[in-house]
Amino acid sequence: MVKGMYHYIAQLWKRPYEGDMLTLMRQRLIKWRREPAIIRIEKPTRLDRARALGYKAKQGFIIVRVRVRKGGLRKQRPNKGRRPKRMGIYGFAPSKSLRLIAEERAARKYPNLEVLNSYYVGEDGNYKWYEVILVDPHHPAICNDPDIKWICEKQHRRRVFRGLTSAGKKMRGLRKSRGLKYTIKYKWKRKQKERLLKKRHEASRGAREPWQIVLKKAEE
């Protein structure tokens, strides 16, 4: 069976930092680091992924590349006295994924457009880059396209801020195949349950409760 162009593009992007792609990605990252955090580009870097997510080379579709800083939250260190453990500056990660953060920043930059989807394009030691597909819901070419005209309806306004994109649904644990397991919310609930079960202060009233009661409180 003859394989098309998109198949070979996808194969290259499975290992973007190996072989001939390594030199190309190095040149791209050097250039991208000097650019603004949010920049509009003419064509998608990953054509196969963009087309799979609904992109079309026609009026009304816009591609934006967004740079997001890697890592957890950058909390300001308190200047009042407390234990270092209670400072609240380390170990706090956002509940949103970096991809969803990139989508929201692109939507704020272009408030008249709607976010269709996004995909990963690269990273270095400090940043990650995503390309966000934006759609103009008021453009005639979009409103008359049977594949994408659903986004022109009023219930899809500001959809990225309501967790209705693919990244937003993943963050909310709405994947049909996996459900809540292994999502950020699942890990948070599991950690809360571990904290309640752990007897850190034997003198406290809750430390001597049976584990069945503690587990029931955690589920509530």
UniProtKB/Swiss-Prot annotation:
Molecular function (GO) terms listed? RNA binding; structural constituent of ribosome
Gene this protein is translated from: rpl15e
One Pfam family linked to the record: Ribosomal_L15e
User: Cross-referenced SUPFAM superfamilies, in alphabetical order?
Assistant: Ribosomal proteins S24e, L23 and L15e
- What processes does the entry annotate via GO biological process terms? cytoplasmic translation
Put simply, this protein is called Large ribosomal subunit protein eL15
Note the NCBIfam families from the entry: PRK04243.1 (NF003269)
User: What keyword terms does UniProt attach to this protein?
Assistant: Ribonucleoprotein, Ribosomal protein
Q: What family does this belong to?
A: Belongs to the eukaryotic ribosomal protein eL15 family.
Q: Which GO terms describe its cellular component?
A: cytosolic large ribosomal subunit
What domain of life does the native source organism fall in?
Answer: Archaea
